[in-house]
C-alpha cells in the first residue's frame, strides 16, 4: 500500500517532467498544407452554402466540425454534447405605414421601416426634433441644446462634406448604426433617418434574425425615409435639405407636424450553435486554454454563395488542424497540462453572437481560462503591406490589452520556434478599423480573459464577396501561422502559472 501511495503521489510530477522533455516542433510539423486544403475545401464548399447564421449550410458545417472532433477523441464540451445551442429571434414585418400631415407614403418608394429594431406600435407625434446629421464626437455635437427624450428625432444619413473622424468604417460616428445608438441613449422614442437612396432598388427585407435577451426598455423604432418626407415635416427648410446642410443652413430645433408611424410584426425562434471539443489536461486540467475561430459567414444571397474561405474558413480549418496536432501529442504521451478547448463559434458576422453567448453562459469558468487564441482570417496576404516579408508575417492584435505577461511570452515563443514577422499595425489604439473590437476574442477580453487575435489584414480584394474562395488561400503561409499558434498554445497550456490579469479593459469608443 505504501509503495502504491508513493507512486500515485509521483504521477503528476512525472507527467510534468515528461511534458518538459517533449519537443513541440515534432507535433507542430504535423500541421500540413494537404490537411488544411482538405478541411478548407470542405468548409468553403457549395454544400455549405456560405454558412449563414442560421442556415442548413451552417448546420452541415457544425456536423463536419463535430465529426472531426469525435475522430480525434476529444471530449464533448457542453455537458455531453459538442454543441452549445443558443436561440435566435426572427422578426417578420406584417404591416407598416407612414403619414405626415395626412399625406400617406408608399413603402420602398418613400420609406422603409427597420426590421432589426422595430416593435409593434402605432405612434403619433405632433412635433419632431431635427438634429442635423445626428453626429456626436469630440469635434461636433448635433444634439447640443436639444432635448429629445420621448420625442421623434429626424437625422440625415451621411456626414458634412468637411467631416473627418478618427474612427472609420462601421463604428464611425457618421455611420447610421452609431447614430441610432446615440439617439437611443438620449432617450428618443422614434427615429427618422433621411436618405438620398429612394426609391429603393431593393425591396424591404421583411425578416431579420437577431439574438437578444429581455430588455429594460424598448429600442426606438426606426424609419428610413426619402427627402420628400422630410420636406413635409420641416416645411420650407426641408426643401433640398442635403444641399442646404452643406452650409448648415437648416435649424436644429423642434418642428410642428402631424406624424404617424405604424409597424407590426410576428416573432419566431430559430437556433444556432457553437461547436466545442476539449482535450483534457493533466495536473492543471481545471485550467483552460481556448483556441477559437468563427465558422459562419454571409450565407447565400439569392443564388449567389458567399464562400468565406478566408473569412473565416481559414480560422475554422486552423482550429481543426491545431486540434489534430494536440491530439497526436496526447496520443504520444505528451498531452498538455491544462485542458485545451477548441471552439468554433457561429454568428460572428451578425455581431459576435456565438462568442457573446458563450462568455455570458460559459461552460468552463472564465476566471480559470488563461487565454483565448482567436484565429480570424489567416489565409491571405495583405496587398497593402509594404514592409517586411509578405510570405512570412501575421498581424497580432490584443496581446498587450489584458495581461502584461502575454506579449513577452508570445514574442519569445515566436523567436524560438516559428520566426514569423509579428506585425502590430492593427493593435494600435488609433487604428481607424478598430479591429480589436471586431472579432470573437473581444467577448473574452471584456470578461478579463487575456487574448491574442491572429489576422492577415485582408480587408480589400475579396473581403465579404463571393470571390473569397479556397483557391486563393496561401496555404504555405497559413501553415507557418498555424505552427506559431500551436507553439504559443503549447506554452500557454504547459507553463506553471496562469497569465496575470493586470491591465484595465479598454472600452470601445464609437460603439
Pin down the residues of each PLM region.
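Bacterial Sec-dependent N-terminal signal peptides
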Residues: 1-22
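Soluble metallo-hydrolase cores and metallopeptidase-like ectodomains found primarily
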Residues: 20-24, 109-145, 216-308, 324, ...
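Noncatalytic luminal/extracellular "stalk/propeptide" segments of secretory-pathway proteins
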Residues: 49-164, 409
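Metal-dependent peptidase/peptidase-like ectodomains
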Residues: 106-107, 220-239, 345-447, 451
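Extracellular/luminal Protease-associated
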Residues: 109-221, 306, 324
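His/Asp/Glu-rich mid-to-C-terminal helical/loop segments that flank catalytic regions of hydrolases
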Residues: 317, 324, 456-511
Amino acid at each position: 500500500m505504501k509503495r502504491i501511495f508513493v507512486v500515485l503521489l509521483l504521477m503528476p510530477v512525472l507527467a510534468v517532467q515528461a511534458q518538459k522533455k517533449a519537443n513541440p516542433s515534432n507535433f507542430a510539423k504535423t500541421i500540413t498544407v494537404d490537411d488544411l486544403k482538405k478541411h478548407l475545401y470542405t468548409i468553403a464548399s457549395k454544400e455549405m452554402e456560405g454558412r449563414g447564421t442560421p442556415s442548413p449550410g451552417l448546420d452541415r458545417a457544425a456536423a463536419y466540425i463535430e465529426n472531426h472532433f469525435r475522430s480525434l477523441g476529444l471530449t464533448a464540451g457542453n455537458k455531453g454534447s459538442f454543441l452549445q445551442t443558443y436561440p435566435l429571434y426572427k422578426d417578420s414585418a406584417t404591416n407598416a405605414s407612414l403619414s405626415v400631415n395626412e399625406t400617406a407614403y408608399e413603402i420602398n418608394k418613400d420609406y422603409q421601416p427597420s426590421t432589426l429594431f422595430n416593435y409593434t406600435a402605432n405612434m403619433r407625434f405632433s412635433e419632431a426634433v431635427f438634429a442635423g446629421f445626428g453626429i456626436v464626437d469630440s469635434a461636433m455635437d448635433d444634439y447640443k441644446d436639444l432635448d429629445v427624450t420621448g420625442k421623434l428625432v429626424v437625422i440625415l444619413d451621411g456626414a458634412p462634406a468637411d467631416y473627418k473622424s478618427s474612427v472609420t468604417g462601421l463604428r464611425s460616428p457618421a455611420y447610421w448604426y452609431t447614430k441610432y445608438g446615440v439617439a437611443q441613449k438620449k432617450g428618443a422614442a422614434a427615429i427618422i433617418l433621411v436618405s438620398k437612396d429612394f426609391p429603393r432598388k431593393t425591396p424591404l427585407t421583411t425578416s431579420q434574425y437577431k439574438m437578444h435577451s429581455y430588455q429594460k426598455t424598448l429600442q426606438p423604432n426606426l424609419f428610413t425615409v426619402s427627402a420628400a418626407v422630410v420636406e413635409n415635416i420641416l416645411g420650407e427648410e426641408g426643401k433640398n435639405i442635403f444641399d442646404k446642410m452643406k452650409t448648415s443652413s437648416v435649424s436644429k430645433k423642434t418642428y410642428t407636424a402631424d406624424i404617424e408611424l405604424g409597424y407590426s410584426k410576428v416573432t419566431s425562434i430559430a437556433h444556432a450553435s457553437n461547436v466545442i471539443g476539449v482535450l483534457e489536461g493533466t495536473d492543471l486540467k481545471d485550467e483552460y486554454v481556448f483556441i477559437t475561430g468563427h465558422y459562419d459567414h454571409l450565407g447565400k444571397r439569392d443564388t449567389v454563395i458567399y464562400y468565406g474561405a478566408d473569412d473565416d474558413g481559414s480560422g475554422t480549418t486552423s482550429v481543426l488542424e491545431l486540434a489534430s496536432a494536440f491530439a497526436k501529442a496526447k496520443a504520444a504521451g505528451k498531452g498538455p497540462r491544462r485542458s485545451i478547448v477548441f471552439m468554433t463559434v457561429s454568428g460572428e458576422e451578425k455581431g459576435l453572437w456565438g462568442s457573446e453567448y458563450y462568455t455570458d453562459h460559459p461552460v468552463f469558468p472564465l476566471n480559470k481560462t488563461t487565454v483565448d487564441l482567436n484565429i480570424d482570417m489567416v489565409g491571405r496576404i495583405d496587398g497593402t503591406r509594404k514592409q517586411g516579408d509578405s510570405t512570412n508575417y501575421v498581424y497580432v492584435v490584443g496581446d498587450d490589452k489584458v495581461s502584461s505577461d502575454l506579449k513577452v511570452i508570445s514574442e519569445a515563443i515566436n523567436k524560438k520556434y516559428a520566426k514569423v514577422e509579428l506585425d502590430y499595425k492593427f493593435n494600435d489604439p488609433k487604428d481607424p478599423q478598430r479591429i480589436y473590437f471586431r472579432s470573437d476574442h473581444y467577448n473574452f477580453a471584456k470578461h478579463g480573459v487575456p487574448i491574442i487575435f491572429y489576422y492577415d489584414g485582408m480587408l480589400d480584394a475579396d473581403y465579404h464577396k463571393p470571390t473569397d474562395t479556397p483557391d486563393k488561400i496561401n496555404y504555405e503561409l497559413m501553415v507557418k501561422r498555424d505552427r506559431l499558434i500551436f507553439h504559443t498554445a503549447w506554452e500557454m497550456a504547459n507553463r506553471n502559472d496562469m497569465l496575470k490579469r493586470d491591465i484595465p479593459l479598454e472600452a470601445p469608443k464609437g460603439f
